[in-house]
Amino acid sequence: EAVQAVARAIRRTRAGLKDPKRPAGTFIFAGPSGVGKTELSKALAEFLFGDDDALITVDMGEYHDSYQVSRLFGSAPGYVGYEEGGQLTEKVRRRPFSVVLFDEIEKAHERVYDSLMQVLDEGRMTDGQGREVDFRNTVIIFTSNIGTQDISKPVGMGFQDSKNANESNYQRMQNKVREGMKKHFRPEFLNRIDDVIVFRQLTEDEILPVSYTHLRAHETRED
């Protein structure tokens, strides 16, 4: 479902059906750790821009206090760090064709959302040095663990085959994620997101080929 949802949004962009002033795509990838949110983001960067280095990752846990927000977008004149520029805006300015991954967005201070609203609305942002940074060619992805804390708990009673149990767990997780997001994020933020994608937990049959792929990649690097 995640791959299909992203593919639909990218096709709309390439067909010219999106607002040209906004980023190429904006998504929330929700789900517990280890379900492939970051891996899909890397694959998307490589597919769209030919290089997985086109993925710009921002750990939002580093911006949970108000005084840290200026590091992301650049300090105002006269403040410490003014000459360095923002850690996000500088990277996007140098690489405007990229996937920008805001990891665990729920950990960020509310001032981050205020600043990002301009990006989601207008596809641009003015950094601390007064330079306009263009986000219109970026795909923006927010990851979140909201609502996934207790999804491993079994649901239902009696006999239930694994397929039905997995589907029941997934539906329960979707509901919890969407309820949690409505409580945590402001409506004006959620309304500017193209799609909220809830990742399924990986089954054993899915984990094995993923592990094999990572081992092969490690062997290739060693060679």
Regions found by a protein language model. Name each.
Residues 1-216, 221:
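AAA+ P-loop NTPase nucleotide-binding core of proteostasis motors
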